[in-house]
Amino acid sequence: MKILALEFSSPQRSVAIVQSGAFHEALGSNEPFAMIAEALREAKLEREQLDCIAVGLGPGSYTGIRSAISIAQGWQLARPIPLLGVSSAEIIAAQAQAGGLVGRVRVIVDAQRGEFYLAGYELTANGSREAEPLRIVSAAAVTQRASAGETLIGPEVTDWFPTGKTIFPRAAILGQLALGRTDFISGDKMEPIYLRETQFVKAPPPRQLG
């Protein structure tokens, strides 16, 4: 299977073509379609030869994730192609495991408003497994875990917690996670992972005059 992977949830955006375990990756903050063209060129593939598009759904940069989803949606409208969505927290954990990290880790991503997304993963020589579901916690809760010696990983995590390990989610790992998966989704159902409720103010009832 030839997979186009788009991971735009962090400041270090990446695009990759993954096929048969090999990958060709473009990193940086370049224009997305230029990065896609670079990855296709390195893989010696045409757009029409792709079998699937995988998208990192966050949590992370809402604008970046929306951009990746829009590209996947537009691609599917132009030419029917299966789409896959993968949690960026899962990508970070898998990347840490591929880098040799083992044991229990907590993936930490900035959720703004003084809060953080947190998910726990168990890393072994055979892979990574979710041990704590993703949720939003206070900065104090993360500080308490750091003080207890827990391993914190994530993009820019050391900006807040100096003992953490900075790991950006990469499209190459996303593509490898997508290999063999069949939980495809239609473009109109693909949404960023965003655990907050939508904030809105209900309009007051109209005043009666007279």
Locate each region found by the language model.
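Short, conserved active-site loops that position catalytic residues or coordinate cofactors/metal ions
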Residues: 33-36, 67
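N-terminal glycine/serine-rich phosphate-binding loop of ATP-dependent small-molecule kinases
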Residues: 1, 36-62
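DPxDG-like acidic metal-binding loop motif
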Residues: 52-83, 88
